[in-house]
Design a protein with these regions (language model features):
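Cytoplasmic-side transmembrane-helix entry/capping segments in multi-pass membrane proteins
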Residues: 68-76, 121-132, 154, 179-180
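C-terminal transmembrane-helix exit sites in multi-pass transporters
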Residues: 53, 58-61, 105-130
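Structural signal for membrane-spanning alpha-helices in multi-pass inner-membrane proteins
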Residues: 54-58, 86, 113, 136-140, ...
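Single conserved hydrophobic/aromatic residue that forms the stacking wall/gate
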Residues: 178-186
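Hydrophobic transmembrane alpha-helices of multi-pass small-molecule transport proteins
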Residues: 54, 79, 124-142
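Structural motif at transmembrane-helix junctions in multi-pass transporters
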Residues: 34-41, 85-101, 176-179
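Glycine-/small-residue-enriched transmembrane alpha-helix faces in small-molecule transporters
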Residues: 1-41, 85, 130, 147-172
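Specific transmembrane alpha-helical segments of multi-pass solute transporters/efflux pumps
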Residues: 24-25, 61-97, 138
């Protein structure tokens, strides 16, 4: 019996491409900054267009009576805050520091899952956490000290990962709640 999804390889490839592009997000940020669009304005310029494109759909859903309440907007705000922090951190610190601090998101996700969803991690999650924290220790704890972010860009990258983790855990909780409500109606 094969327990894999029938599109397992396609999904894996798409995730590989998306993660690679996400890791290169800093390049247009730096280019916009070099072109005179400084600070958070570069981030805002990259986010206003999708917001304006999606806004009519939100109004249309509200008009049709198929609004989800505040659940999904809160998730969107958490996720958007995470992306904004991630994008701005590249302008304030070294790229490698921003990437490492942002990509320890699994640490925060695991903590939030344990606290808010009461889910205990499996053994492979512990391996992931050890690897993530080892990377942080290698980059930030070279002098034998506790690895603490050194500047505002580091802290913003760390905060971005926390926001992304919060949005993911909130999405899981909301999806589970909506799924349970749908099963009850049947």
């Amino acid at each position: 019996m094969n327990a894999r999804h029938k599109y397992h390889y396609s999904i894996s490839f798409a995730l590989l491409i998306a993660a690679g592009l996400w890791g290169l997000f800093w390049i247009p940020q730096r280019a916009l900054e070099a072109g005179g669009l400084t600070g958070g304005w570069a981030t805002i310029s990259q986010m206003v267009i999708p917001f304006l494109i999606l806004l009519p759909f939100a109004f249309w859903r509200k008009y049709k009576g198929s609004s989800f309440g505040l659940d999904y907007p809160v998730i969107g705000l958490l996720f958007g805050a995470g992306i904004a922090c991630y994008a701005n951190s590249f302008l304030l610190t070294d790229v490698v520091r921003a990437l490492i601090l942002f990509y320890i998101t699994p640490v925060w996700t695991t903590i939030f899952e344990m606290i808010f969803l009461r889910q205990l991690p499996r053994y492979y999650r512990y391996i992931t956490l050890i690897l993530a924290l080892s990377g942080v220790w290698i980059v930030f704890g070279q002098d034998g000290f506790i690895p603490i972010p050194q500047n505002s860009g580091d802290w913003i990258a760390l905060l971005g990962g926390i926001f992304i983790a919060a949005s993911a855990v909130r999405m899981e909780a909301v999806s589970y709640t909506h799924l349970r409500a749908h099963e009850t109606v049947r």
